[in-house]
Amino acid sequence: MMKNMARKNQKAPWEEEEEIIWVSRTELKNDMLALQKLGEELVELKPSALAKFPLPEDLAEAIKDAQRFKNEARRRQLQYIGKLMRHIDPEPLQAALDKLRNKHSQTTALLHKLEQLRDRIVAEGDSAIEVAMEQYPEADRQRLRLLARQASKEKAGNKPPKSSREIFQLLKEAMLAKQEIEEESEDDLDSAE
């Protein structure tokens, strides 16, 4: 009994001020699985999107290999990618992936707005076309008016909405042109600094 008391009263081999963080094996394993899952998300990306990520050369090569593999080889390659990711900081990769996901959701929201604008143009005519021209001055006003009249006739005659689709495509092209102009102006500002 005295021996046990003596052990309990002994001073620990580290200083009291030092804080030792004990990490369980389960926690380590969960961290590794999270890295492997991040690697799996990177493997699912298209090569064009993957090129925008700040990847070390060996990791980029491993991801390209994993995209070719099937079944068991793919699973082993994903584990290897997880192992490679232990040696790099995953934060920039996660941030770039989040930015990419956000961009897709923004694009979807813009397409929904374009659909609503198209429906307004078909229903209201010139007043909605004026709103569209304020948002997208690159759009062809005369073509929009012509397509709006045709879409109204198609809707009244229960015909397929060919003109409505053309209005949507016209608005989409105008939106893309506006985005390109904005991106070029941002690039010009960045290069000027």
Curated annotation (Swiss-Prot):
Main location: cytoplasm
PANTHER family linked to this entry: UPF0307 PROTEIN YJGA
Family matches, as HAMAP family: DarP
Protein localization: Cytoplasm
Family recorded in the similarity comment: Belongs to the DarP family.
Lineage, opening ranks: Bacteria, Pseudomonadati, Pseudomonadota, Gammaproteobacteria, Vibrionales
Coiled-coil segments on the chain, per record: none
Disulfides per UniProt: none
Protein known as: Dual-action ribosomal maturation protein DarP
Residue ranges crossing the lipid bilayer per the database entry: none
CC terms in the record's Gene Ontology section: cytosol
Keywords: Cytoplasm, Ribosome biogenesis, RNA-binding, rRNA-binding
Origin superkingdom: Bacteria
Annotated GO biological process: assembly of large subunit precursor of preribosome
Pfam family, one: DarP
Molecular-function GO terms, alphabetical: ribosome binding; rRNA binding
Function in brief: Member of a network of 50S ribosomal subunit biogenesis factors which assembles along the 30S-50S interface, preventing incorrect 23S rRNA structures from forming. Promotes peptidyl transferase center (PTC) maturation.
